[in-house]
């Protein structure tokens, strides 16, 4: 049951509801109790009662001798309201000076948020819930809480709830951003290149020829002797990641064209192109390291050279053994490496002098070149031809590409 009672001086001075326990009406209010302050109630002046603040003990709430009417108890707590409607919490503008005042006002209400009965519809219902300043939900009136930044995919997602804390749409956009993914790809390539330069690997285990028709194995199981480090598996995983990033970028451009949205700015495309070329040159450095290692081992280690030249599976025709040519391992290795990188070269739209793969017919893309096929891309490649490649002794990018092509030819002609 709601019963009007005078508010204490502290609650009245700060224009807040004076809330008391329903069973202890004569004790201090909840707000003064938590603040450990004296709860002084300034009753209306009566004859013979002195004015002022000298006799504070006489201004405490006297115990009520009147017996309240008998009523069925309800689970909703009884809240003591202020006797003046003019000092209730204002809604529009009183707390708009700063969000700090509004938040302090809400915290000073001493609402027991764990008591779900205070929101019960029994009794007088909504009258039992204290008013909350509307400035808490107004970004325009706040000086400390900044409004959320605009998010393009928010309205399209169908989520009409106001964002608080983290913004999942922004996190998704950052994860799917091609620029961030290309930067991550650069880090993976650098780490893989350091591993190639630091660790040795068993060529006879990694380049072992097996028949795919008899128990085809996964790439992770191809290198049993040196399972801890298989350079081909790591290289092909990076190439697959490279293809996925380029496909995401291609789909983003196509989606903008279908929706008649302005295409990506030229500055952004140039930034993507530079990062993609950097990733491609790092991948060529990985290839250069792999081919150099195989050639060095084949020239210095007789067992490796014999394995590369003579480890040919027996092939029969009508029951007769067919003499197999030499260096099947070396030529198969060179062909596989060219086939893998050819898909990346086609997706980038690289011209012939920038490619190391020789079979161009198997990677002809039906779509137009994405990054480097236009005039801007060709001009960018012309500028980069003379640039030095970091970490390589070769003088320029074109020198690196030419060196890798020569090593591929040397591996194919070991016999």
Curated annotation (Swiss-Prot):
Residue numbers spanned by region Disordered: 41-99
Species the sequence originates in: Gibberella zeae (strain ATCC MYA-4620 / CBS 123657 / FGSC 9075 / NRRL 31084 / PH-1)
Gene Ontology annotations for the cellular component aspect, listed alphabetically: nucleus
Known role: Transcription factor that regulates the expression of the gene cluster that mediates the biosynthesis of butenolide, a mycotoxin that shows antibiotic activity but does not seem to play a major role in the spread of head blight in wheat.
Chief localization: nucleus
Keyword Transcription regulation: yes
Keywords annotated in UniProt: DNA-binding, Metal-binding, Nucleus, Transcription, Transcription regulation, Zinc
Name of protein: Transcription factor FG08080
Biased composition (Polar residues): 86-99
UniProt lineage: Eukaryota, Fungi, Dikarya, Ascomycota, Pezizomycotina
């Amino acid at each position: 049951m709601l019963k009007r009672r005078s508010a204490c001086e502290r609650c009245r001075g700060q224009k807040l509801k004076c809330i008391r326990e329903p069973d202890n009406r004569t004790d201090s209010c909840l707000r003064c109790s938590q603040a450990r302050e004296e709860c002084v109630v300034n009753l209306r002046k009566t004859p013979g009662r002195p004015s002022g603040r000298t006799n504070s003990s006489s201004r405490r709430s006297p115990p009520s001798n009147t017996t309240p009417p008998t009523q069925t108890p309800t689970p909703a707590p009884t809240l003591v309201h202020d006797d003046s409607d003019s000092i209730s919490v204002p809604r529009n503008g009183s707390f708009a000076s700063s969000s700090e005042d509004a938040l302090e006002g809400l915290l000073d209400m001493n609402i027991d948020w764990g008591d779900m009965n205070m929101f019960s519809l029994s009794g007088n219902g909504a009258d039992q819930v204290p008013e909350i300043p509307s400035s808490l939900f107004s970004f325009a009136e706040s000086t400390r809480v900044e409004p959320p930044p605009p998010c393009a995919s928010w309205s399209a997602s169908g989520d009409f709830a106001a964002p608080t804390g983290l913004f999942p749409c922004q996190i998704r956009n950052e994860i799917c951003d091609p620029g961030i993914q290309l930067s991550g790809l650069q880090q993976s390539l650098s780490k893989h290149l350091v591993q190639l330069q630091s660790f040795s690997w068993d060529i006879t285990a990694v380049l072992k020829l097996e028949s795919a028709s008899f128990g085809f194995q996964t790439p992770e199981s191809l290198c049993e002797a040196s399972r801890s480090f298989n350079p081909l598996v790591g290289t092909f995983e990076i190439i697959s990641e490279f293809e996925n990033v380029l496909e995401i970028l291609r789909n983003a451009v196509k989606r903008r064209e279908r929706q008649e949205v302005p295409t990506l700015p030229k500055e952004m495309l140039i930034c993507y192109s530079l990062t993609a070329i950097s990733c491609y040159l790092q991948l060529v450095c990985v290839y250069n390291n792999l081919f150099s290692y195989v050639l060095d081992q084949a020239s210095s280690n007789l067992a490796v050279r014999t394995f590369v030249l003579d480890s040919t599976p027996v092939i029969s025709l009508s029951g007769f053994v067919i003499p197999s040519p030499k260096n099947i391992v070396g030529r198969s290795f060179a062909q596989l490496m060219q086939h893998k990188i050819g898909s990346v070269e086609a997706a980038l739209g690289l011209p012939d002098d920038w490619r190391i793969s020789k079979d161009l017919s198997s990677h002809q893309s039906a779509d137009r070149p994405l990054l480097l096929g236009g005039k801007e891309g060709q001009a960018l490649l012309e500028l980069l031809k003379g640039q030095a490649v970091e970490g390589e002794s070769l003088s320029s990018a074109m020198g690196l590409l030419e060196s890798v092509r020569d090593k591929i030819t040397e591996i194919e002609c070991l016999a």
